[in-house]
Amino acid sequence: MAVTRTLFIEDHRPTLHLTLYEHSPQAPTVIFIHGMTAHAGFYSEMIPGANYLKALAEAGLNIIALDLQGHGRSGGARGSLTYADAMRNIRRAVDFALAHYHDRIGITGSSMGGILAFYAALEDERIRAAVCHNVLDLQDIRPVLYLRRHFVLVPLARALRPLLGILGGLPIPVRAFLEPSHVFEKPENLRRWRADPLCVWAYRLSTWISIFLEPSDKPPIEAMAKPVRLLVGEHDRILPADYHRGFAARLRCRKDLVVVPGAGHMLPLEYLELTVPLVAEWFHTHLGSI
């Protein structure tokens, strides 16, 4: 039985909200990073009977689910998050894990959270293993652009980079870059998502540019040295399976790619029973079983 509690990290600003699902003191400890718009509770409370975080804990993991700044119950301006902010937030979660558990720490994430989890594992030597539901080379996002509007808005955003000092706070709707109907397969889940009062539906121009359109502060993906498992749905339209095959082929570390047959984008919630064992098994293998 997993023990659940929530708390705030207040050692620095902004305050960060954590949701903990604890299995046992010696279980592998895994930090979870949510996707775009979302927060930790999105993966535990939004769909009745689909508590992904609890399921991971019941599979033998201690889960530290982080609300990135500007999201959920964490501090910071809504929709304001740079790549450097995200890496700092995750480092603070690792600090917490080391202070309260042990050093057998992994990281996992979904969608944008999978992308950020990959880079956090690459950059933070204390993270020993990763499972990423979706990845993307943030030095070059062009291979995954597929919506007609991408080919107008992405060049426009790049052109506005010199004006970030003036226009950086401009709110850009999530729908400009992400098609909501491609996230969930079930219409009722899409409705639940849209009704979630803690979700962020616009990001500042500076956020879009910092995370997706500024290659200079991103290390090459080939530098990854940790064992990493990549997960993707066979029919994911946002970050396709073929892209993940090419990404995995470039990695030099111990790696594994699992393409979930018949699945779309939202593996943690719409394919929970398939996803949880894939995540838990990797961490038990590379962080040690209880």
Question: How would you name each of these model-derived features?
Answer:
Residues K226, P240-A249:
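Short alpha-helix in the alpha/beta-hydrolase fold that links the catalytic acid
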Residues M112-P197:
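Alpha/beta-hydrolase-fold enzymes
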Residues N51-G75:
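Conserved alpha/beta-hydrolase
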Residues M224, L230-V232, D236:
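Short beta-strand/loop motif that positions the catalytic acidic residue
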Residues A263-V276:
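Catalytic histidine-centered segment of alpha/beta-hydrolase-like enzymes
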Residues M1-H23:
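N-terminal cap/lid segment of alpha/beta-hydrolase-fold proteins
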Residues M36-N51:
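The serine-hydrolase catalytic nucleophile loop
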Residues G72-R104:
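Catalytic nucleophile-loop/oxyanion-hole region of alpha/beta-hydrolase
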